[in-house]
Amino acid sequence: PKRGRKNRLTHLVYALDVSGSITSYQAQQFLRSAKTLKEKLNPKLMTVMLWDTRIQFEKVFREDETLDNIKVNAGGGTNLQPVYNRVRQINPEALVIFTDLCVDIPPKPTWETIWFVPDPNMYKDQYMNQYLQAVTYGDVYVVPEK
């Protein structure tokens, strides 16, 4: 059997933006990235949330489960506050957010936050750099388009 790492994550929350500004391609790309993240980090628990103005889907996956049968339907507005409210209840070690940042960023939380955003060079929104500057906490990573 595989041995766990000493500093292994016990609970990671992965929040995928499925609002109307997210393209179908981006949503699928974000989901593929979630699968890769789970394989690499292998937390004991990984809560996956799909959200727009509310949490549309939430499921906890154990370390021996794969992220399968998650259907993504993008549409609607964008509000991160319901995600932050729920994450506050869960109290994980980290929150990973995949979003295009077309959202008001809540105040800095107590948990570690990691942002994954589309490549601004490929993104059609002229305000993308402004959105990136709105993120004042956590680490921001760019997801290449291809």
In which residue ranges do the predicted regions lie?
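Structural beta-sheet core signal
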Residues: 14, 48-50, 97, 115
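Catalytic P-loop NTPase motifs of RecA-like helicase/translocase cores
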Residues: 21-23, 104-105
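An active-site-proximal "capping" alpha-helix that borders the catalytic cofactor pocket
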Residues: 28-50
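VWA/integrin I-like adhesion module and closely mimicked acidic/polar interface patches used
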Residues: 29, 102-146
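Residues that scaffold, gate, or flank divalent-cation-dependent active/transport sites
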Residues: 17
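Acidic, polar low-complexity linker/tail segments
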Residues: 1-13, 22-25
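Von Willebrand factor
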Residues: 47, 55-60, 64-104, 120-130
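Residues at the starts of beta-strands that form the adenosine-phosphate
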Residues: 11, 45-47, 94, 112
